[in-house]
Amino acid sequence: MRLGLSSRSARSEEGSEIFLEGPVDGELSRLHRQRKVMELERRAYSREVHQRIRKQVEEIRQLEMLRAKLQMQINVAQTQVKRLGDKKRLADMDHLLKCRAQVQIEIEALQEQNRALEKQIQDWETHILTQSKDISTPDVILDQKMKIQRRIRILEDQLDRVTCHFDIHLVRNAALREELELLRIERGRYLNMDRKLKKEIHLLQEMVGALSTSSTSAYTAREEAKTKMGMLQERAEKELAQSDTEAQILLRQISHLEQLHRFLKLKNHDRQPDPGVVQKEEQRAWETSEGLRKTSQEKLVLRYEDTLNKLAQLTGESDPDLLVEKYLELEERNFAEFNFINEQNSELYHLQEEIKEMQEALVSEHASQDKQSLEREQQCKVLQQDVEKVCSESERLEARFQVLRVQLEKIKTDIQVLFDKAQCDNSVIKDLLGVKTYMRDRDIGLFLSTIEKRLVQLLTVQAFLEVQNNVPLADAALLALGQSIQEPPKKTTPLKPPDTMEDSSGVVIKDDYPMSKEELLSQVMKLVQLQDEEGSPKKRDSSPSLTLSSPRISLAAASVHARKASVVPESILSHKTGRGRGTGSISHVTFGDSASAPGPVTLASTSASGLPVSGRGSQGGRGAFKHTSSSSYLGSTGYLETSRGRESGTGGGHSQSMGSEMSRGFSSGSGQTSSAAPASRPSSATSKDSRGYN
């Protein structure tokens, strides 16, 4: 139901609308054009980004295929190269880790710079909105501006997400390019090493082939020389034995003849010869003279002739000169062969020495290779131990991550259940996040801020209903703060809300102009009189009060109180439309402690036009009644930080947010309680009534 509207305020508002109609239309058309241009730029940029991402994904896929192929080739050839490249891989890993740490530092610096820029942008926006609040504009224009700003922020958020995604892909592409470049360098080194090893193996094979050929030929020549040496040795032995035999025979004959000659001389000198012997000698001499008896020379000649005949039969040559020439030729040939055999034996000895030296070198090389292989195996064992340690650490961290993930999923499920039970408004969440069937990790703050907003709404409604039931303001304040009336506030650890939480709205007053002090007091007095006339005193609900430590809300009792409150006419909880524009505002009610020093009750209401109206009452304690526009809910989304609203009160600049009150706890024993709603447009502290109070 619409509240009373004075003629003076209506005339002033109509005059301001006529006066501001032209500039507002121009500004609105300019904003529409700017929005269209930004939409076209966003679409073009989105298409370009998606096309670039597709190209990069295709390139990444091709590079991964090439990497898999190279990895397969490297694994095939990794038997020898792996041992040689362990140290280089460790150095590369160290370098990559250092690069990763440096990149993380750079990313953090960029994030800090981005946050500083966002804060500066928000400060400028706050300054612009503060300057624009002095101009009284219609509610529709401001509502459209807020919607445009919210849409711009949503688009900026989406653009920021796409940009982050694009930056992540760029970083991954850079890492893959670096890894690919390292793999190419490693492949080139491996190919160079492979070519060198193949050349060395080829040279060794040629050397081994030449050595085997030379050793085979040397062995064959050695065997032939051995055979010839054996034959010559046997022949020399035979000739030596034959010459020794002939020499012995000749020596025996000579000695026999000498003995015989000496004996004959001795006999001849000693005695007279025997007549028979003399006769025999004479007869031998006569036979010799007659040629009947052959001498020793004749016998030797006959023997030589017999030997020549045998040689002629064996060789087929009867000429003694030719036999002598052939014999000399054979002797020369045998001597040449003997010299050749001696040379071959000396060369064979040198080759054997060289073979022995090469065998010793091969043994030493094998020993060094075995030593290097043992060292590599030890290094591999050490690296394997390090890898096992890292794997165990990663498994431990993965298990811990899984446990934390399960806890987080449970928390998300509980938050969703609490969100559904509290019947929170999810329209803003759908506008920001779209229709999703699941909750992301970064959306938890958004859901918690929405739940807390709903909780404060229910607490405020309950406190207002208790005030209607003539409950003291101190008890109503305790109920609004979620504390029990009978029990003193317990010292419990409060739940710390997110930093971007917007102050929860309380009583909703849908009005198109700010209410004055007299109008607000008249409305409250009418409500009290109507309740007294209706008679039946309302009993307080026996359900346990709501506390922040255990957020359990009795929705049935809240709905009953809401139905009872809706029956009362001229209620400040009812929504009304003004001049067909349907603009609404949300009021926030906070009550101070009755034990505090008496002071004025400040009832401030800010409409969509941003004009504050304050009132003064005579009740004890302090209270503040302040409403903010519904479009300021963007401050609690968790994506955009909004500036905190300020609230000026009597006795000094006492301003604090709802989140700071909750972080300090409600059981601190403070004598006064105040709440301010952080919005995207902080309320100005230069209102007329507040200046009057100050």
UniProtKB/Swiss-Prot annotation:
GO CC annotation terms, alphabetical: axoneme; cilium; outer dynein arm; outer dynein arm docking complex
Coiled-coil blocks: 27-192, 222-259, 339-418
Biological-process GO terms, alphabetical: cilium movement; outer dynein arm assembly
Biased composition, class Polar residues, residue ranges: 655-672
Q: Which family does it belong to?
A: Belongs to the ODA1/DCC2 family.
Whom does it interact with, and what assembly results? Component of the outer dynein arm-docking complex along with ODAD2, ODAD3, ODAD4 and CLXN. Interacts with ODAD3. Interacts with ODAD4; this interaction may facilitate the recruitment and/or attachment of outer dynein arm docking complex proteins,including ODAD1, ODAD3, and ODAD4 to ciliary axonemes. Interacts with DNAH9. Interacts with MNS1. Interacts with PIERCE1 and PIERCE2; the interactions link the outer dynein arms docking complex (ODA-DC) to the internal microtubule inner proteins (MIP) in cilium axoneme.
What is this protein called in UniProt? Outer dynein arm-docking complex subunit 1
